[in-house]
Each structure stands twice: as structure tokens, then as C-alpha cells.
């Protein structure tokens, strides 16, 4: 799952697009108009039997919770998994992971574009789809690395904390590290 918004502030910048993939090489794009309820999307996000894979889940979960009132669960975050499994690098962006783990070049050219437009361009649609098409394959690679380094339990604990981290973010404590001295 990925989201596209008008900016990076969930309170100011509306959710415009949600991208989904089952890992079958296809992507479903849900364009959200203002005040759209998205009942089927909400049902899927809340479905406990479906693992939701994100890259930087913290942001997408906050946007989805704020915009649709649903906290996605259960979740897997490829960015967190990468940080725990790939401690030899500081390159944990989706573009870097796709290149280094899958040999796939992702274009980020449309990342900052008008996602609120009534009609999205083919370039925007291609970009949006590419952001979810490889998440399942990345999860598999990262999961193998986490197992190899005996860090899968730590990753699961981080994923379990994400809803709390998101609630802290949404309540105004985005820079709070509750564990800091």
C-alpha cells in the first residue's frame, strides 16, 4: 500500500490516491475525491487477515488514519525492515531498495506533482503503480535478511509499535522520542 497526498502534513494536505497491490504484478489505484467515504478501502485496511505492506508505513498510516478514520493493521514496513537488516548502509529509500535488492530502477520524477488533479496523467499513474508493485518482493528479500541476522522479532516489535507512533504523530508529538532521557 502507498498513498499520494498534496503534501506532507496530514491535517493540511488531503489524501488523493491510494495504491494497492497483491504482489501479483498488478496495482489497483483508488483516486479519492473530497469527502469520499471509500467503504471498501476502509474494510480492507481494517481486515485483520490481510497483511498491509508499506514503505515508510509511519506516514501512510497517519494519512489513512486521519483521512479515513482507519488504522491499517496488521502492517509490515520495508523501510523499518531495511534499517534493521541492512545496517551496512544508510540508503533505505524505496528507489534504493528496488535497485539494490531487485535490480529495478524506479523513477521518482512524478513524486511531487498535483495528485489532486481531476485527471491524473499516465506518468503519474505509472509512478503511483511502481511504488507498490515491488513491495512484496522487497519484503521477501528483507525478511530473509532479518532471519539471517536474527532480527525478525525486533522488526515485528517495531511494526507492533507503529500504531502508537502514528497516534503520537497525529496528536502533535511527531518529534517526541518517548524513550529519550
Name each model feature, range by range.
Residues 1-181:
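DEDD superfamily 3′-5′ metal-dependent exonuclease/proofreading module
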Amino acid at each position: 500500500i502507498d498513498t499520494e497526498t498534496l503534501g506532507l502534513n496530514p491535517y493540511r494536505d488531503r489524501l488523493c490516491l491510494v495504491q494497492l497491490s497483491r504482489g501479483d504484478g498488478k496495482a489497483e489505484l483508488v483516486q479519492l475525491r473530497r469527502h469520499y467515504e471509500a467503504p471498501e478501502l476502509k474494510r480492507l485496511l481494517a481486515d485483520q487477515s490481510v497483511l498491509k505492506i508499506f514503505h515508510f508505513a509511519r506516514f501512510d498510516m497517519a494519512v489513512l488514519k486521519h483521512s479515513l478514520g482507519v488504522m491499517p493493521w496488521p502492517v509490515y514496513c520495508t523501510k523499518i525492515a531495511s534499517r534493521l537488516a541492512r545496517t551496512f548502509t544508510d540508503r533505505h529509500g524505496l528507489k534504493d531498495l528496488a535497485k539494490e535488492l531487485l535490480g529495478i530502477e524506479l523513477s521518482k520524477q512524478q513524486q511531487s506533482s498535483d495528485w489532486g488533479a481531476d485527471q491524473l496523467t499516465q506518468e503519474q499513474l505509472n509512478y503511483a503503480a511502481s511504488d507498490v508493485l515491488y513491495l512484496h518482493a522487497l519484503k521477501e528479500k528483507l525478511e530473509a535478511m532479518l532471519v539471517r541476522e536474527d532480527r525478525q522479532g525486533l522488526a515485528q516489535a517495531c511494526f507492533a509499535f507503529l500504531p502508537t507512533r502514528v497516534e503520537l504523530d497525529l496528536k502533535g508529538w511527531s518529534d517526541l522520542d518517548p524513550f529519550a532521557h
